[in-house]
């Protein structure tokens, strides 16, 4: 059977990335407490294409991905190595996004409910292996300016803290979620009874935060974590009294700690 993809391309233009995206795939995530959580990931993967080759065999991505069942750094490097070999490439890239549920107790009534966070993993292999993990955690922020100038209350809203890290040691998704929540005005909960609502509302009022505050405090905590070699923090607030959102962003190398 004729192999069209392997035909020599006369244009001689190399391509940096060729691949597939938005592939939905079942997989398991290791829980910090113990066991696994099943989820459905959205996957994108690619390789570079030599200037003399017309195309790649897309089906080979799926064949290689068949070994992806549980998320570990080791399996990602294996997949990238396999892609480089089977595609005769120099570089391979793999990115997955998936929902992850953390069971939380409400602060007063102790009612349990799941909180959805969005997790992602990005891996790349050329000469060296690069591996990033991250979470996008929903939190609660209350505006310090609004509190200061108002006789009653202050505007507050849901916000999202996105943390991306490179690490020298394994780090749990739950650890990153905890860092995001502790530096906001208040965590979010799926289930709140009236005493819980009172607690969360008052906690946020006593702990006002701009997106700038959240981004800086999260960055300082990541900066001091010996497991983390690089990080990026992005905070976005779904402003309740404005027709726009507010955001702040910082990554390792943007500042130097003094003292």
Swiss-Prot record:
GO biological process, one term: tetrahydrofolate biosynthetic process
Annotated GO MF terms: GTP cyclohydrolase activity; GTP cyclohydrolase I activity
Site (May be catalytically important): 143
Pathway: Cofactor biosynthesis; 7,8-dihydroneopterin triphosphate biosynthesis; 7,8-dihydroneopterin triphosphate from GTP: step 1/1
Its EC number(s): 3.5.4.16
Record field: catalytic activity: GTP + H2O = 7,8-dihydroneopterin 3'-triphosphate + formate + H(+)
Keywords attached to this entry: Hydrolase
Signal peptide coordinates: none
InterPro entries (UniProt xref): GTP_cyclohydrolase_FolE2, GTP_cyclohydrolase_FolE2/MptA
Family named by the database record: Belongs to the GTP cyclohydrolase IV family.
Role summary: Converts GTP to 7,8-dihydroneopterin triphosphate.
Identification of the protein by name: GTP cyclohydrolase FolE2
Species of provenance: Thermotoga maritima (strain ATCC 43589 / DSM 3109 / JCM 10099 / NBRC 100826 / MSB8)
């Amino acid at each position: 059977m004729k192999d069209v993809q392997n035909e020599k391309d006369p244009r001689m233009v190399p391509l940096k990335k060729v691949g597939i995206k938005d592939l939905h795939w079942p997989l398991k995530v290791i829980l910090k407490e113990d066991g696994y959580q099943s989820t459905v990931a959205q996957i994108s993967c690619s390789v570079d294409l030599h200037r003399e080759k017309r195309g790649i065999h897309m089906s080979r991505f799926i064949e290689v991905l068949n070994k992806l069942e549980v998320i570990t750094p080791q399996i990602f490097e294996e997949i990238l190595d396999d892609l480089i070999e089977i595609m005769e490439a120099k570089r391979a890239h793999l990115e997955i996004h998936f929902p992850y549920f953390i069971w939380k107790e409400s602060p007063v009534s102790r009612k349990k409910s799941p909180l959805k966070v969005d997790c992602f993993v990005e891996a790349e292999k050329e000469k060296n292996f690069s591996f990033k993990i991250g979470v996008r955690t929903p939190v609660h922020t209350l505006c310090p300016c609004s509190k200061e100038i108002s006789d009653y209350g202050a505007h507050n809203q849901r916000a999202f803290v996105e943390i991306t890290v490179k690490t020298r040691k394994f780090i749990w998704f739950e650890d990153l979620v905890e860092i995001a929540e502790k530096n906001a005005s208040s965590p979010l909960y799926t289930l709140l009874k009236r005493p819980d609502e009172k607690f969360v509302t008052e906690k946020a009022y006593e702990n006002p935060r701009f997106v700038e505050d959240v981004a800086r405090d999260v960055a300082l905590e990541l900066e001091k974590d010996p497991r983390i070699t690089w990080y990026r923090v992005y905070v976005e607030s779904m402003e309740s009294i404005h027709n726009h959102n507010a955001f702040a962003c910082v990554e390792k190398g943007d500042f130097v700690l003094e003292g």
